[in-house]
Amino acid sequence: MSKIFVNPSAIRAGLADLEMAEETVDLINRNIEDNQAHLQGEPIEVDNLPEDMKRLHLDDEKSSNLGEMVRVGEGKYREDFQMDEGEDPNLLFQSYLDNVGVQIVRQMRSGERFLKIWSQTVEEIVSYVTVNFPNPPRRSSEDKSTQTTGRELKKETTSAFSQRESQPSKARMVAQVAPGPPALEWSATNEEDDLSVEAEIAHQIAESFSKKYKFPSRSSGIFLYNFEQLKMNLDDIVKEAKNVPGVTRLAHDGSKIPLRCVLGWVALANSKKFQLLVEADKLSKIMQDDLNRYTSC
């Protein structure tokens, strides 16, 4: 009976990867805590407010105006990360940041570069805060005894609601496993387009099903791998390939797709043997280079 010997260098490399992953998770958690520092401040006491603030009051009008404004927004498209009326914005923001942290870890496991992931994440968090925490209007320095009437409240609420409706949705970018450049984003508008995209991807993969592609190995060399070694159904490969940034757009335009990048993506997610053989950092660079080369054509 043959025995399987494990190379000690492979074990050490695996342990090093685990330690790096733990350090990365700790760094992400610290960054999230830093971004939440403004939520941990001391509450404002009413007695400590300026005298001008104490003179502010709301006119006791019926809430029918607010109800009308809420009904105006019914039937319109609601942004993915836009909060519902009556929900605690701080709790929703905390939940949103938790999801962002989980998504960052997933993207790093898939080989994405941390700096690229973090720059995109910062933009998404800023957009979320801009939509759901609009800055209050500044008071005039000349009129210190301003009274907030029901008419002013209606104007402010309407402007805030219109601002939310006009903001572009970036939560879809967070929901992707590994988001690509915004210019590469595309989604099928109907079932017919989606089927044509899948057919184009399947056609190109089937033509190169047995072709071997070079990948960097952990032993500082290379190894050959092809779609046949995945032992997967073609439909499953196509479904996974559609998650590669830019592939659906290229297939929709009838252009060539980066097959080596697609193979590396699918194998990294579904083949344990491939995960043990490949050097993740070098693979990430190769896949990114392939994407850039094909999408720039």
From Swiss-Prot:
The keyword Phosphoprotein applies. GO terms for molecular function: molecular condensate scaffold activity; RNA-directed RNA polymerase activity. Residues 138-172 are annotated as: DYNLL1 and DYNLL2 binding. The modification Phosphoserine is found at S63, S64, S162, S210, S271. This is Phosphoprotein. Keywords: Chaperone, Cytoplasmic inwards viral transport, Host cytoplasm, Host nucleus, Host-virus interaction, Inhibition of host innate immune response by virus, Inhibition of host interferon signaling pathway by virus, Inhibition of host STAT1 by virus, Inhibition of host STAT2 by virus, Inhibition of host TBK1 by virus, Inhibition of host TLR pathway by virus, Interferon antiviral system evasion, Microtubular inwards viral transport, Phosphoprotein, Viral immunoevasion, Viral RNA replication, Virion, Virus entry into host cell. GO terms for biological process: microtubule-dependent intracellular transport of viral material towards nucleus; symbiont entry into host cell; symbiont-mediated suppression of host cytoplasmic pattern recognition receptor signaling pathway via inhibition of TBK1 activity; symbiont-mediated suppression of host JAK-STAT cascade via inhibition of STAT1 activity; symbiont-mediated suppression of host JAK-STAT cascade via inhibition of STAT2 activity; symbiont-mediated suppression of host toll-like receptor signaling pathway; symbiont-mediated suppression of host type I interferon-mediated signaling pathway; viral transcription. It comes from Rabies virus (strain CVS-11).
